[in-house]
Swiss-Prot record:
GO BP term (any one): translation
Protein name, UniProt field: Large ribosomal subunit protein uL11
GO MF: large ribosomal subunit rRNA binding; structural constituent of ribosome
Keywords of the record: Methylation, Ribonucleoprotein, Ribosomal protein, RNA-binding, rRNA-binding
Family under the similarity heading: Belongs to the universal ribosomal protein uL11 family.
Subunit structure of this chain's protein: Part of the ribosomal stalk of the 50S ribosomal subunit. Interacts with L10 and the large rRNA to form the base of the stalk. L10 forms an elongated spine to which L12 dimers bind in a sequential fashion forming a multimeric L10(L12)X complex.
Database matches in CDD domains: Ribosomal_L11
Disulfide bond in keyword set: no
Post-translational modification: One or more lysine residues are methylated.
Protein task: Forms part of the ribosomal stalk which helps the ribosome interact with GTP-bound translation factors.
One annotated Gene Ontology cellular component of this protein: cytosolic large ribosomal subunit
Amino acid sequence: MAKKITGYIKLQIPAGKANPSPPVGPALGQHGVNIMEFCKAFNAETQSLEAGMPIPVVITVYSDRSFTFVKKTPPAAFLLKKAAGIKSGSGKPNTQKVGKVTRKQLEEIVAMKKADLTAADIEAGVRTIAGSARAMGLTVEE
């Protein structure tokens, strides 16, 4: 018989830096999950990634207090900022541009995020990510 699911927890944790302090500890503690066990498992799975890269994770908690988790790809905004070499997006994206990204960079981001994007093909994914880039005040170069 399958285990009964008691809840889902969605968090965004820096790669290799999960620790019991907020926001991780309280979120897991509410559901009775062993916090250190999750932190060790998450850090082990993300040690190959760039340290500090935010990784969205969905934790499924079962009635016997066990858990499984699924890692997602880093947010598009983080990848765009990294590609453009900027610290943050523009406060006024329509008037104040803060950087540039090329189509090749967008294609690399789409290739990385392919599993989490709903786009039908690479071209649609590029358009989606290009829209995110423009919303952040980045200029998209063809």
